[in-house]
């Protein structure tokens, strides 16, 4: 409820007197002089005028008392000396209290008062009573203003328990009443008496006390006004208590902790260290609201999920019900079958028994017995036959099903058998064709010594169309190489000592049945060509990689072969004296199909050819040129599928005469693809050997064609061992032709492929440069589809080479560059690296070409290569071309390629650098399909003319990067870490990828949203310390009737508006018990109402009501009894309900027996409150609604609808009305009676209600404020009083002067009185106190902070003199009977405003 505001009114004496108002209406407060002067003309001095003494506004109880004082004899009743003594005593108490309060605590500043000291000093004259009262009024006004300001600064509840505050309130109204009394008396008309010494001394004491009060006020003024601006900006209705302030601070701290705990990226704008300003608090609350919104969204999603789950659960329930019904049906059928069998068996037994009895009794003949037995046997046989037939039918069905299944399995087995037979036929055909091709190759590749120049390098024999179980088709090109007999047994012996060990050799037995394994082991040279092909759509691309491996003397590293996935094979075919061609299973070789498919693949996609002019060597023989051109033509026929680009590179061999190439720098390219769970490892190890062979033998024994078909999840490890030998080669072209290695490796999507080429130091002396170039050359063309990553590491150690003919070398190596696939959106990261060396250069052009090649190397993110700095280059052209060869590797889209080029220490003597440079150029054109990007790290040395000496220092530093630092690989989540010798340091970034979409539970835990639930209305209530608006309460109980009522009562400790309970209790009758707890009233539920209406069991209904409601409320049954037994039922009613409440029937008796019945009536009800407004209002509600309203709102206030019923059912409805509202409300008939008998009725009514009130005036008053009465709420508890005091009664209709007396605690003086009509208090909360007819007014004086509601004292005053003490009186009655609130509710109970 809203707090009360203070208003000040001025009296005729220029003394401002405060009057309290509220938005709901006026309370029962003392009347100002102006209001009372309006009614002076209406007052009848002959009648007794009550002086109302109002209790102090304590936090414990507010009780109204009445003290009738005759206005004509006031001067005799109030002796001046005694009154002044009491006032001085109280002023001393107030001063001591204020000194204790304000002497130590200077918190309350206030606005200065304009007051002259001469006004205070003038009061010491004491000429008349009016001047003294005026002074007191001014002083009380000042104190009231100070206290009102204190109330605005958060210490109101301290003063509710402070005696000084109570005294000021009491003193204010006391002075007001004394003024009015003195104004209406004739005492002021007479001459004032001569001043007495005691009076003078008392007045002097009062002046001193006033001066001390002024000092205290000045202390309060000294406080700075800066803090007041913030504090006074608060609303007037805010409860400002120290506990509330502490709770606010605690809540602010909790808010900061909450924000810190739940601070995320979007909430970090709100800092917990901001100053406590309105803006910062707004931001904090906004942040909290955002968190709550997130929680609300999460809750909404959870609710939606719950709805879906509920729907699924209902569906499951329905399905379960259907199944249960079906089960019941089946059980019923089964039971029927069992019953029929039982019936048949029982019938048979009964028949047998009956037949036996008949045989014994009647003595039937044997023929009849035989007939009966035969009939029984027939019946039994029939039953058995029926059962057998049923069983046979069931077995027949089962057998038919089994037969169907067996037929299906047989068909499947047949299909599988046919499939296997067809596969075997295909395999036999492929093997036969392999043998024929081998024979053709043997017949065509016989070469002698130096005549090998005229032998063609390659012959394309056929194309195999391979279809495997997975439905994939691969096309293989079969190349035949000439067979050259070995002329040196030393080479064979050395090479046979180091054999190649691989688990893939076990697979050779399935394909190469005609091969002898010992021949494979004794071969001196190995050339592995791995071909990994998969059937792809025309939009997909295919790469082929060529790898040339020479035989080795010593194998430095063990050969590691990756595990093969299911349906994948790894085939390693050696090329020994007769050339061996390995093919996959189920291959159908057709030369025509090979040609057709070659043409289709050649012209599928737009091709891009890039030609370099070929300059013939001056000293080159024509035969050499022819052989080179043939090899180039063969290599140019390698095509790609759609979306691929073809790039043919023709280098220009420059042939200076004999140049010895001491060391050749080859870069090891490392292409690591980490997309799938596959890895391809290629290790090319070149050990050191010193071998001397003729060219024909060397060339033919080192060619090995590997066709490896692998599908997804295939790991292929190819180790190419290239021995570093010291060779003296006689024939050049034979060596050049046989050194060519074609490695076609095509992996399907998500197949990582890793190639490591390792060439250790070698000391080679080659007679012919072509043979050496081919043995050294390793071309890796690794094609991966989109979504792959290739990392190639190429390492080139120092070598000592002797090359005679460079042209053949350059031309042959140029052939291997034609697996080029340049799809759209290539990404090519090129970081040129230059080695800072101190070489001895003969030809500057060759050096520049080598450097150009080095700068085209691709390294991902910081790849470095640190070469050695002791190398000698004879011709820079050859070196530059060498480097150019290695730079043309393109990685697929969305991937990065790491290329590390290491140029170690070399001593190079180049005979023909042009051929060497072209050799290197051939190796670098490895192009991978997919969406790729080109990143070029430009350098100034991109031309042939620039040498190492012209490089800048920073460009040389780039060449000194180590390959170990380029380990940043970009991988997908599905890739696995690839470990090998050269790439073991590379981290697998796929394992470190964070979760992109965290789950909701993770967000809740990270944001600590699970702790937000604890912040509920109670904590907010403690934080705000405020009562919500009534409109909010109106909506809340209606929407949440079950849970909000108790919460509202406990949280705010206030009486919730009555209208809400009315509406709610009508619509939700089952929640009335909860309403009873909220309003602390006995609520009668519907069950009780129905029980009350039972006429057959009146006694049980009464006891049940007494036990449940804790009130002696007798409802409809008593009404019925009082109709039949008017006299006897009155006593029964009084005993039953514990009160002298005589309803309806007495009203009829009062009309016939006015005098006697009035007294009895007055004794019965103890109150005489008549409300005329109720007559007009109680017209539209039924009987049940009357009880409901009374119990729901906890007041005896029936608003309007009852009177219409009372007119039609006067006897019963009046009793019902009285029971419903719990008050003695006298309706219609007494009002008419009082009007007709005014004189006689006044005294009995005065005795009845405890004060003499004119009926007509009270009616007018109650019309506007029907729910408040001066006397009916006397015994109410604090919580109920708060609800009442938020409304005020218009005092204009009172005919008397009212004086409020608020005594303080004084244990020395006690007043006890026992009324002759006093009876023992009943169990009801409301207690009745009556005085005899000789008393004109009752005064109830409770102790401050000690007296509870429902206890009072009666003081009898003579009509002439009043002798009483203003301080408090001691309570001699027992403990109060009202209910004690819960501790939580008591803390939150606010105190009324004044």
Curated annotation (Swiss-Prot):
Skewed-composition ranges (Basic and acidic residues): 363-375, 447-462, 491-500, 583-600, 695-707, 722-736, 791-806, 830-842
InterPro entries assigned: CCDC7 (IPR029272)
Composition bias type Polar residues, residue spans: 437-446, 464-473, 503-513, 521-538, 546-571, 663-679, 711-721, 780-790
Biased composition (Basic residues): 349-362
Region of interest (Disordered), ranges: 345-375, 431-617, 634-806, 819-842
Name the record gives this protein: Coiled-coil domain-containing protein 7
Coiled-coil segments on the chain, per record: 308-340, 383-421
Keywords: Coiled coil
Organism whose genome encodes this protein: Macaca fascicularis
The encoding gene: CCDC7
Function, in words: May play a role in tumorigenesis.
Top-level taxon: Eukaryota
């Amino acid at each position: 409820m809203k707090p009360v505001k203070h208003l000040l009114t001025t009296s005729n004496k220029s003394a401002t007197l405060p009057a309290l108002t509220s938005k709901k209406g006026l309370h029962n407060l003392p009347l100002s002089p102006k209001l009372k002067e309006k009614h002076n003309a209406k007052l009848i001095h002959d009648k007794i005028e009550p002086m109302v003494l109002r209790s102090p506004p304590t936090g414990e109880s507010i009780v109204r008392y009445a003290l009738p004082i005759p206005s004509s004899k006031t001067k005799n009743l109030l002796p001046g000396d005694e009154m002044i003594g009491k006032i001085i005593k109280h002023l001393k108490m107030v001063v001591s209290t204020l000194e204790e309060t304000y002497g130590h605590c200077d918190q309350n500043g206030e606005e200065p008062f304009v007051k002259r000291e001469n006004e205070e000093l003038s009061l010491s004259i004491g000429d008349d009573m009016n001047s003294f009262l005026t002074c007191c009024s001014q002083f009380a006004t000042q104190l009231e203003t100070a206290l009102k300001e204190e109330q605005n600064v958060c210490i109101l509840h301290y003063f509710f328990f402070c005696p000084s505050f109570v005294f000021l309130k009491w003193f204010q109204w006391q002075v007001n009443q004394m003024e009015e009394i003195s104004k209406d008396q004739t005492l002021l008309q007479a001459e004032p008496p001569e001043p007495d010494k005691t009076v003078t001394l008392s007045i002097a004491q009062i002046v001193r006390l006033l001066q001390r009060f002024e000092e205290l006020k000045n202390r309060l003024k000294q406080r700075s006004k800066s803090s007041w601006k913030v504090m006074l900006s608060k609303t007037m209705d805010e409860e400002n208590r120290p506990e509330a302030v502490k709770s606010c601070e605690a809540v602010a701290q909790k808010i900061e902790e909450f924000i810190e705990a739940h601070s995320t990226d979007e909430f970090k704008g709100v800092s917990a260290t901001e100053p406590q300003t309105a803006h910062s608090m707004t931001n904090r609350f906004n942040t909290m609201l955002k968190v709550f919104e997130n929680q609300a969204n999460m809750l909404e999603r959870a609710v939606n999920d719950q709805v879906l789950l509920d729907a699924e659960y209902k569906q499951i329930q329905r399905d379960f019900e259907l199944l249960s019904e079906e089960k019941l049906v089946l059980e019923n059928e089964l039971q029927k079958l069992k019953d029929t069998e039982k019936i048949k068996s029982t019938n048979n037994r009964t028949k047998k028994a009956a037949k036996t009895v008949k045989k014994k009794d009647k003595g039937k003949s044997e023929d009849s017995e035989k007939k009966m037995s035969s009939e029984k046997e027939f019946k039994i046989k029939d039953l058995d036959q029926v059962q057998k037939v049923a069983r046979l039918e069931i077995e027949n069905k089962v057998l038919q099903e089994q037969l169907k299944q067996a037929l299906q399995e047989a068909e499947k087995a047949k299909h599988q058998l046919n499939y296997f037979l067809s596969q075997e036929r295909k395999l036999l055909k492929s093997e036969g064709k392999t043998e024929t091709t081998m024979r053709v190759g043997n017949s065509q590749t016989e070469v002698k010594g130096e005549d090998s120049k005229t032998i063609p390098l390659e012959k394309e024999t056929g194309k195999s169309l391979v279809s495997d179980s997975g439905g994939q088709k691969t096309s293989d090109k079969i190349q035949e190489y000439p067979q050259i007999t070995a002329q040196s047994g030393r080479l064979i012996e050395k090479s046979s000592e180091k054999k190649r060990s691989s688990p893939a050799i076990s697979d050779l037995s399935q394909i190469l049945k005609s091969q002898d394994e010992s021949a494979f082991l004794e071969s001196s040279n190995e050339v592995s060509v791995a071909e990994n092909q998969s059937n792809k759509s025309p939009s997909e691309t295919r790469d082929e990689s060529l790898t040339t491996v020479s035989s080795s003397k010593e194998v430095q590293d063990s050969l590691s072969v990756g595990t093969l996935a299911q349906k994948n094979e790894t085939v390693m075919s050696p090329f020994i004296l007769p050339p061996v061609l390995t093919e996959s299973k189920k291959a159908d070789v057709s030369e025509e199909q090979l040609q057709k498919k070659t043409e289709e693949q050649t012209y599928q996609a737009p091709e891009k050819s890039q030609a370099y002019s070929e300059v013939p060597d001056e000293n080159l023989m024509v035969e050499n040129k022819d052989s080179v051109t043939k090899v180039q033509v063969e290599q140019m026929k390698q095509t790609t599928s759609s979306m691929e680009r073809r790039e043919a590179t023709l280098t220009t061999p420059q042939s200076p005469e004999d140049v010895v190439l001491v060391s050749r720098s080859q870069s090891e390219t490392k292409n690591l693809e980490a997309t799938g769970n596959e890895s391809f490892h290629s290790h090319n190890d070149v050990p050191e050997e010193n071998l001397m062979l003729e060219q024909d033998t060397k060339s033919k024994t080192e060619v090995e064609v590997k066709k490896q078909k692998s599908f997804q999840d295939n790991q292929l490890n190819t180790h190419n061992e290239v021995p570093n030998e010291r060779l003296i080669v006689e024939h050049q072209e034979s060596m050049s032709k046989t050194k060519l290695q074609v490695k076609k490796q095509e992996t399907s999507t998500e197949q990582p492929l890793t190639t490591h080429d390792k060439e250790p130091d070698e000391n080679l002396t080659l007679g012919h440069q072509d043979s050496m170039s081919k043995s050294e050359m390793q071309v890796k063309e690794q094609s991966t589809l989109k979504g792959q990553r290739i990392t190639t590491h190429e390492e080139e150690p120092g070598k000592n080479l002797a090359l005679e003919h460079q042209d053949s070398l350059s031309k042959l190596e140029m052939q291997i560059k034609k697996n080029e696939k340049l799809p759209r959106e290539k990404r090519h990261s090129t970081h040129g690296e230059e080695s800072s060396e101190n070489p001895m250069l003969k030809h500057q052009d060759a050096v520049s070409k080598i450097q150009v090649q080095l700068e085209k190397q691709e390294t991902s993110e910081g790849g470095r290569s640190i070469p050695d700095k002791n190398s000698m280059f004879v011709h820079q052209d050859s070196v530059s071309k060498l480097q150019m060869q290695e730079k043309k590797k393109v990685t697929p889209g969305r991937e990065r390629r790491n290329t590390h080029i290491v140029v170690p220490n070399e001593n190079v003597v180049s005979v023909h650098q042009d051929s060497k440079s072209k050799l290197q150029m051939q190796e670098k054109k490895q192009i991978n399909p997919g969406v790729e990007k080109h990143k070029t790290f430009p350098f100034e040395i991109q031309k042939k003319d620039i040498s190492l000496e012209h490089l800048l220092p920073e460009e040389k530093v780039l060449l000194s990067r180590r390959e170990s630092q380029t380990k940043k690989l970009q991988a997908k989540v599905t890739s696995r870490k690839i470990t090998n010798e050269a790439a073991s340091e590379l981290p697998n970034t796929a394992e470190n990828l964070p979760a992109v979409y965290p789950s909701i539970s993770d967000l809740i835990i990270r944001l600590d949203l699970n702790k937000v639930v604890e912040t509920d209305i109670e904590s907010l209530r403690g934080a705000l310390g405020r009562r919500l608006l009534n409109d909010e309460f109106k909506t809340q109980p209606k929407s949440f009737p079950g849970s909000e009522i108790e919460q509202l009562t406990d949280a705010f400790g206030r009486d919730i508006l009555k209208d809400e309970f009315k509406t709610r209790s009508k619509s939700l009758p089952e929640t009335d018990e909860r309403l009873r707890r909220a309003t602390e009233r006995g609520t009668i539920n519907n069950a009780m109402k129905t029980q009350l209406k039972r006429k057959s069991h009146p006694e049980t209904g009464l006891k049940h009501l007494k036990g449940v409601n804790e009130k002696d409320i007798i409802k409809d049954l008593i009404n019925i009894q009082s109709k039949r037994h008017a006299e006897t039922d009155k006593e029964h009613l009084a005993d039953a309900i514990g009160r002298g409440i005589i309803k309806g029937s007495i009203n009829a008796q009062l009309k016939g027996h006015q005098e006697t019945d009035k007294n009895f009536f007055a004794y019965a009800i103890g109150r005489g409150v008549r409300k005329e407004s109720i007559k007009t209002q109680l017209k539209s509600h039924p009987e049940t609604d009357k009880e409901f309203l009374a119990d729901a709102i906890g007041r005896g206030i029936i608003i309007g609808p009852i009177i219409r019923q009372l007119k039609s059912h006067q006897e019963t409805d009046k009793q019902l009305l009285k029971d419903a509202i719990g008050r003695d409300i006298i309706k219609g008939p007494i009002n008419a009676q009082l009007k007709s008998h005014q004189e006689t009725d006044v005294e009995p009514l005065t005795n009845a209600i405890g004060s003499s009130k004119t009926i007509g005036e009270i009616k007018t008053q109650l019309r506007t404020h029907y729910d408040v009465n001066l006397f009916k709420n006397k015994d109410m508890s604090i919580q109920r009083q708060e609800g009442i005091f938020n409304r005020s009664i218009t005092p204009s209709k009172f005919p008397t002067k009212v004086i409020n007396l608020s005594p303080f605690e004084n244990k020395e003086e006690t007043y006890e009185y026992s009324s002759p009509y006093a009876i023992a208090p009943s169990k009801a909360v409301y207690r009745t106190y009556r005085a005899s007819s000789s008393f004109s007014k009752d005064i109830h004086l409770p102790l401050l902070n000690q007296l509870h509601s429902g206890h009072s004292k009666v003081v009898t005053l003579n009509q002439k003199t009043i002798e009483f003490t203003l301080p408090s009186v001691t309570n001699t009655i027992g403990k109060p009977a009202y209910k004690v609130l819960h501790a939580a509710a008591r803390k939150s109970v606010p105190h009324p405003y004044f």
